[in-house]
Structures are given as C-alpha cells and as structure tokens.
Regions:
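Glycine-rich phosphate-binding P-loop
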Residues: 1-3, 222
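Phosphate-binding active sites in nucleotide-utilizing proteins
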Residues: 218-294
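A short helix->loop->beta-strand "cap" motif at the edges of active sites that frequently abuts
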Residues: 90, 146, 294-298
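Cysteine-nucleophile active-site neighborhood
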Residues: 248, 272-346
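ATP-dependent carboxylate-amine ligase catalytic core
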Residues: 3-88, 96-119, 132-136
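C-terminal and late-domain segments of enzyme folds
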Residues: 216-218, 230-240, 247, 333-336, ...
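Residues that mark the start of a beta-strand
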Residues: 13-17, 219-221, 247, 323
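Internal gly/pro-rich beta-alpha loop/helix module
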Residues: 102-214
C-alpha cells in the first residue's frame, strides 16, 4: 500500500521521501524502488528523537510529500508507530484490511482514532476491498468526524511475494515495478483529500545545524559486502561511517574472487543460507577474508555475515556448506523464528543499540566477550564474539546510536 501511494505521487511529478518505522531492511528496498529516493529508518529507541527529527527535517526541505510506513499495528511495540506520530505531530492514516468486513470497519476506525486522545489521527484507508459496492458499505460505516482517504481492491497480481524473514528483496522480486505501477493505478480516491500540512520548522522543528563527527575514520577504506546474500544495511550506518572520514567500497562474497583494497570489512546480514553452494565454492574469497583477518585488520560481522564466518552453515533441508572458518563453530537454520527484538550491548568501545531477528541457532567454540540486553524484560540475550580484530554477533548494530564507538570497531 505504501509503495503504491509513493509511486502514485511520483508518477504525478512529486518528489516523495518515504521512511520506515522501526528496524526493517526488506520493506525499505521495495519502498526505495517505488519512490525512487533513498529510505531511512525512524526508530526512537535505536536512534533517539533528535536523530529522527534531523532526518525528517532534512527530508522536508527537499520533498513534496513525506510518507512514513508504520511497523506492525499502530500501537504495537515500545516505542510504537503512534509514539512517532505523536512526537512529531504527523497525521496518521490507518490502513485497514477490509477482507470479509462491513460495519466493523467503522468500529475499528473509531477505536483506533480514540485509543489515544493526543494522537493526530487523520483518517482511514480501506485495503483489499472486494468491489465498489463493498467500499460503499465500508465508507458508510466510518464516523463522520473521520476522513476516508480512499481504497484499494484485492488483487493477487499486486501482492508481493514473501519468505521466512519477510518480503523478497527488491532485486529478487519478479516484475516488481510492474506490480507497484499496477497497484498505484488501482488506488481509488487518494487524490481527493489530503491531511493537514505539517510545517516542520514552525510547528515541530526549529532550524538546527547538522551534527558533525570527528574524522576518526579518515583514510580508512571499508569493504562492505552487498549482494543477494548480504544486503541488510542501514543507510544511516554507511552515512555515519562516511561522515567520519571512511571510504566505502562495495564487494560481493558471491561473485568476486578477491577483496577490494581495504583496511576493514563490514559483513552485514542477509540470506547466506539461500546461497550455500556459491558461497562455499568461492574458495578465493574465503581465503582472502582469512588473510585480511590474519593481517590484523578489522572485521564487523552481523547476523548472516557472522554465519558466513563460521566453519559451516546448514539450511532447513539439511544441506551443508563450508564457510570461511574464522569463527570455530557451526549454525543450522530453523523453521521458526529463534530471536527477535531491540537490544543494547556494552562493549569496551561504548554502548550500542540495535536489533536481532533470525531463524538460526549457532554453536561457537569461543567464549562470548559480552551479551546483549533486550529492551523487553523477557527477551533473550545475544552473545558477542571477538577473535582478534573481528567483532561478530547476531545483532544488527545501529551506528547512529553510538557513532564514535562504531568507528572504533573498524580501526
């Protein structure tokens, strides 16, 4: 729905900036394709309100329209999408799945609108509508004080394919642009009414200079893995590294035989389990990563990037692949989610915030140097491993949570 709305306005000549609430990698890939503009995550716990405020303020200076896609339900999580909307006074349009629903649609709309009195609730949008007459029933159920922002019919041709971690990556989705374009063309009533304009400068934001960071990474070239196996990257992470002086050089553990000429490596998460044969067969790349480590150079490996550095990785079908072998141990993919949530961890460099989300279990023969702490009291801690200048964990670090400490990981 958000992708369709972004493309709808883009097709009409507007510059659209889209943000994603919370720690997500897959939805942003789709939304970037739809809007044609870079996407950043807004997470009040990981990045803080000043960081989120700055991102929105900068986007408002260049965009005609800002869309923010929520995460889960409007009030789910702590912080939740409603918290973000309330803090920055951003109008909320609730997208409600209307499948097998009539008057209950209005009851849901009224409940969402009144659940928190301070929430700037603007109205509702009906998704997966069966027909024009079905929409009329839905519209008649909406209380008069609420606005209907339109509707989208149910259509299998615009449904985006998924797998165990969520949507397929944009690069893997067949006919993605065609699906988005069709969804945008199918939107009904979205141009009829718009919410009240948010004046960031006078109503929520004041002019502020962009935060500057010491050039701790000046002259440091960082090789960042980016391909179909490793693609879970926050733009804000790369921006912070560059702002501190680093030069980013992308490479592919799947397709390249050697590393670029770099002083440090960043192996983000992704889907190494879907590319076992190719990763296992690329002996030259594995050897070059080992040589990089043996030379005393830094490596930061997150989630799938960490699994790649183990001795072996086994998928859910029992297929096994020989990995890099820098971390003594093995991992096996699981059919069910094994950990999820926001986490913080205190390392000698400083305290980091981030999140974990994975379907694997691993055994490592070295002792962790630290364990993360879940933001939820009942969350499961994640171990952090160190081997020389290698730092590895299931955690996806959010570098803006501790920029200078993040720089130290790559030195």
């Amino acid at each position: 729905m958000t992708a369709a709305l972004a493309r709808y306005h883009r097709d009409r000549g507007r510059r659209v900036r889209v943000f994603k609430t919370g720690p997500d990698f897959l939805d942003p890939m789709i939304l970037e394709r739809a809007s044609g503009e870079p996407l950043y995550q807004l997470d009040l716990w990981m990045g803080g309100d000043v960081h989120c405020r700055q991102l929105l303020y900068e986007a408002a200076g260049e965009a005609d329209l800002i869309l923010i896609e929520g995460v889960m339900g409007l009030f789910d999580g702590n912080p939740c999408s409603a918290d973000l909307a309330t803090l920055f006074n951003i109008p909320v349009m609730a997208v409600i799945d209307s499948t097998a629903m009539a008057q209950t649609f209005g009851a849901l709309a009224l409940g969402l609108a009144g659940y928190r009195s301070e929430l700037p609730f603007a109205g509702v949008f009906a998704n997966r509508v069966a027909s024009q007459s079905h929409y009329q029933m839905l519209a008649e159920s909406i209380p008069p004080e609420l606005t209907s922002f339109g509707w989208l019919a149910r259509d299998a041709d615009i449904t985006l394919p998924e797998r165990h971690l969520g949507l397929l990556q944009a690069i893997e989705s067949d006919n993605l642009d065609e699906r988005i374009e069709k969804a945008a063309a199918a939107l009904n009533g979205v141009g009829d009414v718009m919410p009240e304009t948010v004046n960031f400068e006078t109503r929520t934001f004041s002019k502020q200079s962009k935060v500057s960071y010491p050039l701790h990474l000046k002259g440091v070239r960082i090789g960042v893995a980016r391909d179909q196996a490793f693609a879970f990257l926050y733009r804000s992470n790369l921006d912070i590294l560059v702002e501190m002086g680093a030069e980013i050089k992308f490479f592919s553990p799947l397709n390249d035989s050697v590393l670029p000429d770099v002083e440090a490596l960043y192996l983000p998460g992704g889907y190494p389990e879907l590319h076992l044969d190719s990763l296992a067969a690329n002996e030259l790349m594995k050897a070059d990563i080992c040589a990089h480590h043996a030379a005393g150079k830094a490596i930061v490996a997150e989630c799938g990037g960490m699994l790649y550095l183990l001795d072996s990785l086994t998928d859910t079908e029992g297929r096994n692949g020989s990995m890099v072998g820098l971390l003594p141990g093995k991992a096996e993919m699981q059919a069910r989610l094994t950990n999820l949530g926001l986490h913080s961890v205190a390392l000698p460099e400083g305290e980091f915030r981030g999140h974990t989300f994975h379907h694997s279990r691993m055994q490592c023969d070295i002792e962790p140097v630290a364990y993360s702490e879940s933001a939820r009291h009942h969350g499961t801690p994640e171990p952090i491993f160190r081997q020389g200048k290698l730092t590895a964990s299931y955690l996806h670090f959010y570098f803006p949570s501790s920029p200078e400490a993040s720089a130290c990981l790559f030195l």
